Amino acid sequence: LIVRPEEIAFDVDGVFADTFRTFVDTARRDFGCDFSYEDITEYDFRTVVEIEEQASEAIIARILEDPIGSGIEPIPGAVDVLTRLAGLAPLLFITARPEETAIRSWILHHLPGVPGSAVRVVATGTGENKRSALLDHGVSCFVEDCLETGFLIDPYRVRPVIFDQPWNRKPHPFHVVRSWRQIAALLEWPRV
């Protein structure tokens, strides 16, 4: 699998942003929860970890409204690969977040070497709506952490690449990457 830079798009949370780790850290620190990152074995984490709904909603609201202030960090290796990639083609992020302003600010904050004009963010509001956004932008490959989205887009000739996380380790037919180095290996880079 080799992907042209202009034909790849990325999810944000769980692929570029280490959002779930921030969720776990905040739940433990601010709400006294006793679960670990590896305990999140379902994308809908509320079905597998013990957390009060009010606490969960408060953390999610904080993460959605202020990803920078929430302390979300990039997944290791992401900044380097995305900065290199932005030199070849505009970056495209497709997120199920309800709005793009806060997460676009987070992306630009963590990609200081990339001009804002080289970053496109599409907030779809739901995972189901990612398919049409991907098709509208001519994407042939999408790096995603949610298996359900993989199954939604695969029949439409958008190849899902699943970024390994504890919640997507069930059997599936998709290509898996475990690091940004592995993502970089999928890309068609210019010959030097």
Predicted features by range, described:
Residues 1, 131-136, 141, 146-192:
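Asp-based, Mg2+/Mn2+-dependent phosphohydrolase catalytic module
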Residues 94-143, 147-151:
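Substrate-recognition "cap/lid" segment bordering the active-site pocket of phosphatases
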